[in-house]
């Protein structure tokens, strides 16, 4: 039996059905999925746990503590949920890039 894990990341233009892949060996099966928001994240996690028997969920640094808790509650105590956070300097670099890339452009901002 292979160990099954999913890595989830956020992007404002994500479509989980389209933006994902699976990497598989005889001992490890890794699902990678990009989601638009927390609602999609919860639904994707619940679906993969039910349909694929996921053992571990790894979340990108953009997930908040509340997001992590909500996902952990949704998938149950038999699934590990962790966040890929680095040290202080690494986290700041990641946060700055996400702010620059994901912030609405002036032309995209609501009137």
Spans of features found by a protein language model:
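A polyampholytic, Gly/Pro-enriched intrinsically disordered region
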Residues: 54-55, 100-111
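Alpha-helix-loop-beta-strand connector modules within alpha/beta enzyme cores
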Residues: 65-86
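Amphipathic, hydrophobic secondary-structure cores in small proteins
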Residues: 51-63
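Hydrophobic faces of well-ordered beta-strands that scaffold small-molecule active sites
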Residues: 5-7, 31, 58-59, 81-83
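Short, well-structured alpha-helical segments in soluble
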Residues: 43-51
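Short, charged, surface-exposed secondary-structure boundary motifs
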Residues: 89-96
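N-terminal basic/disordered segments at the start of proteins
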Residues: 1-17
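Glycine-rich phosphate-binding "P-loop"
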Residues: 22-39
């Amino acid at each position: 039996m292979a160990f099954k894990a999913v890595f989830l990341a956020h992007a404002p233009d994500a479509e989980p059905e389209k933006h994902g892949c699976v990497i598989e060996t005889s001992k490890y099966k890794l699902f990678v999925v990009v989601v638009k928001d927390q609602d999609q994240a919860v639904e994707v996690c619940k679906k993969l746990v039910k349909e694929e028997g996921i053992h571990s969920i790894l979340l990108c640094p953009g997930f908040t503590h509340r997001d992590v808790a909500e996902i952990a509650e949704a998938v149950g105590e038999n699934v590990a949920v962790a966040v890929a956070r680095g040290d202080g300097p690494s986290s700041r670099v990641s946060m700055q890039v996400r702010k620059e890339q994901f912030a609405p452009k002036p032309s995209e901002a609501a009137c």
